[in-house]
Amino acid sequence: MKIAGQVSLADLPRVCPLLCRSDDSEYGEDKTRVVEVRGVRFGDERPVVIGGPCAVETREQTLNVARAVRRAGAEMLRGGAYKPRTSPHGFQGTGADGLRILKDAREETGLPVVTEAMDTRHVEQVAEFADMIQIGSRNMQNFPLLAEAGRAGKPVLLKRGMAASLVEWLGAAEYIAEQGNLDIVLCERGIKAFASGEYSRYVLDLNVIPAVRAHTFLPVIVDPSHATGVASMVEPASRAALEFGSHGLIIEVADPTTARPMCDAVQAIGPETLARIARFAHARSSSAVEGVSCA
């Protein structure tokens, strides 16, 4: 029985004609599109490591973390200037001031910056300061925002919605691609399940990594910080994600010399842990995934 609005992986060629793998595509059955962000190449042989604070709180805090993640081996800097919070009473970020701090951090460290745009009104401003625009989990199906990000002329990091199927996730990416922008990197960041919150923040869906690689030519990375919500789990989750073929990682890092982070402090790792993860990542090839496939 056909149900209105129901789609499956079999519908991908119709739902995502721009991003779905096909025999006549230049990417064929197994090639990945390389998305370049100021010299950092997603989808290439070497997995990319992105590190930085959950939120840009102060100039000192952000610059300290930026220096630390660069020393640890990260290739890009993350940090939220605009913050989507569960409660309106939580810290909402530093906005435009935070974007300027991120720009200063990039100029000092040389690390390209990825940060989130939460609203269509923010996209132009974020694109002015950042090298890559992030669309967060809560906005994965904010279709006007996706289209605006696609028109901004910058690569886009699209996080999976916490309750989104693979088809819905790729359908969201198609909104960006329809604007003529194929420089999209997908990010698995954990999904909600019956056990969510019992012993981890979300459930890290490792199985989706080979599925993404089988059905689209876009690179896919993993956010082990939000997926686990526990700092001690971030390193093993990172290793597992790379074993499953992730093209990279985006990880929250705290500066131990400054105050406790205002957001998600318990999931932030220290620079030493990031350095171990980076060494593991850079010793691997994201294109050689033994024994992991999704027909």
Question: Where in the sequence are the language-model features?
Answer:
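Catalytic alpha/beta core domains of metabolic enzymes, predominantly
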Residues: 37, 42, 152-257
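Catalytic beta/alpha-barrel core
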Residues: 94, 110-122, 131-144, 155-166, ...
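Active-site mouth loops of central-metabolism enzymes
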Residues: 47-64, 88-92, 112-116, 136-137, ...
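Alpha-helix-loop-beta-strand connector modules within alpha/beta enzyme cores
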Residues: 91-115, 149-155, 206-220, 244, ...
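N-terminal small/glycine-rich loop or linker at the start of catalytic domains
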Residues: 32-54, 85-88, 213-222
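Conserved beta-strand positions in the central sheet of alpha/beta enzyme cores
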Residues: 10-21, 78, 114, 134, ...
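Glycine-rich, proline-tolerant flexible connector loops at the mouths of alpha/beta enzymes
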Residues: 78-96, 255-265
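Non-catalytic terminal accessory/regulatory regions of metabolic enzymes
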Residues: 1-49
